[in-house]
Amino acid sequence: MKAAVWYGERDIRIEEREVKELQPNDVKVKVAWAGICGSDLHAYLHPDSVPMNKNMVIGHEFSGEIVEVGSHVTKFKEGDRVCIYPMMLKDPSNAETERFITIDAVGAHIDGGFAEYAILPQKTIFKIPDNLPLEVAAMVEPAAVSFQSIKDLNVKEGDTVVVYGAGPIGLFAVLGAKVAGASNIIVVDLLDSRLDKATEMGATHVFNAKEVNPVEEIRKLFPDGADVTVEAAGVESTFNQAIQSTKVRGTMMVISFHTEDIQFNGPASLIFSGVKIMGSVGYSNETYNEVIELLANGGLPAQSIITSKINIDNLVEQGFEALMNDKSQSKILVKLSGAH
């Protein structure tokens, strides 16, 4: 089969590989669509920032159809349409704690979804309804990351939420805040095209940080600051601005990868504001199922986040390199079988 294999910094190769032998608790998935995640891009550019095994088939945001099941598989059957829950938790029922402990993942420690077929443990599989298109189902994973962060922040009806960064994770955070009932959703980015998408997703206010000081503008609108802020950009400036945008005793959530150390005046900015900083990784089974249901019922306009669809042969040039060089790109999907 054709597969994209990660060898190290800026070294992803499209190769022919044998499909691995199916074990009793495994399922064989014919991959339909796979998304390029920000963490995939970090592995491509900054290998030390992402724990991965070399010579792995990468990709953890994907969907497809089961074509074979192992002898001990009881929940799934041939023909089931599925998406992937890539965190390989030892005890998925304890995801609230274990998602911060277990870092093994599909596409990093076992072969992932940038391939024609994937052999996966049955615990990493979620069945999807027939009315959920497979290309949309490939985005369940990033949507769940953002929705879980909004849950962890305990966003409630009437809250004011600021999101720094309008890439896919930031845009899904906007949707999560909207579903949670936030009254005001402010998005900050450097590109008008991304801010336009944020408005389409439900942002009530947007600011281009190249044109205005976002903290000043947010404080003009909401003098006390935001109830919560979400840092989804992954740079030093937005980290500090997110803290400064948050109200006294509010919470700032970090869901971005920071590949470099940052500087911030922690004692002063935190002691004298009472702002809490927290992080979130992964998701619970409950959140995953909620996102699947919302996407299937049309409650999330996820199609708008897709900016390109490419073939696996062009993964590096039209995928990874495009995300680096064309900042108008948001979510790039890779077509494998292309099934609907």
Describe the function of each predicted region:
Residues 82, 132-211, 216:
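Mid-domain Rossmann-like dinucleotide-binding core that forms the NAD(H)/NADP(H) cofactor-binding site
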Residues 153, 201-276, 339-340:
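Glycine-rich cofactor phosphate-binding loops and adjacent beta1-alpha1 units
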